[in-house]
């Protein structure tokens, strides 16, 4: 139960930070940002926006989180990430705190 609460808190934190980043963008979203939302496909994130998100998350959690492990797969950058994928990554990194 505690793990579920922690995971939900991480998801809400990621959503809050993403919403803060896109608040001035003129997005016509069909649905609210959720764990199923993809950064590039749904929110039109650029690579710079993804870097800003990573920095904001590191500042929020007050530690380096080695996002290169999430952003690269088989030596290539991933094409897109969902809020859920980011949250799962964060949960695995924060377990050792």
Task: Label each PLM-derived region with a short phrase.
Residues 2-45, 49-55, 59, 63-97:
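Phosphopantetheine-dependent thiolation modules in NRPS/PKS and related acyl-activating systems
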